């Protein structure tokens, strides 16, 4: 049980997918202008990353490895992610049309989010078992969502702040992301992974 807690904390804080591994930067910068959209995107990505990591583990261990075709991993994982994203898009469209409109083009773009493919491939490289794979996917998504919501809240504050003209827009956003990354580096010694 302690190992699973360390995996969760390590993935969310110490090895954060956005600020440490630099995966998922496109939605991090693109959807983080408002907290509502960042939260919605975070929830959708959490669902997709968790489900995709579970499906990827199942496909890898029960199809790719027994048939001795591990070279098809990337292609199979991309297909799995595309199917999971389409399922998520249908669910969000039916359950929350307002969120579906807010997320717009970014919902189908979860398919191309490198963090989703990254979690599936890293699960295989780390030789996680089924429970560890599910927890790793969920933890990576929680870390992604946490950083996106925090970044969106900071960007909302910066939108009304008196920022010097050369730093307005993307410049201050990148500086803020860098400072957040430095802040998360403070968690480095928290967990040995």
UniProtKB/Swiss-Prot annotation:
Record has Membrane as a keyword: yes
PANTHER family xref list: INTEGRAL MEMBRANE PROTEIN OF SOXR-REDUCING COMPLEX, ION-TRANSLOCATING OXIDOREDUCTASE COMPLEX SUBUNIT A
Subcellular location: Cell inner membrane
EC number annotated for this UniProt entry: 7.-.-.-
A single GO cellular-component term on record: plasma membrane
Name by which UniProt lists this protein: Ion-translocating oxidoreductase complex subunit A
UniProt KW Protein transport keyword: no
Bilayer-crossing regions: 5-25, 39-59, 62-82, 102-122, 134-154, 171-191
Keywords from the UniProt entry: Cell inner membrane, Cell membrane, Electron transport, Membrane, Translocase, Transmembrane, Transmembrane helix, Transport
Principal location: membrane
Gene symbol of the encoding locus: rnfA
Pfam families per record: Rnf-Nqr
GO biological process, one term: electron transport chain
Function: Part of a membrane-bound complex that couples electron transfer with translocation of ions across the membrane.
Classification via InterPro entries: Ion_transpt_RnfA/RsxA, NqrDE/RnfAE, NqrDE/RnfAE_oxidrdctase
Membrane topology label: Multi-pass membrane protein
Similarity comment text for this entry: Belongs to the NqrDE/RnfAE family.
Assembly: The complex is composed of six subunits: RnfA, RnfB, RnfC, RnfD, RnfE and RnfG.
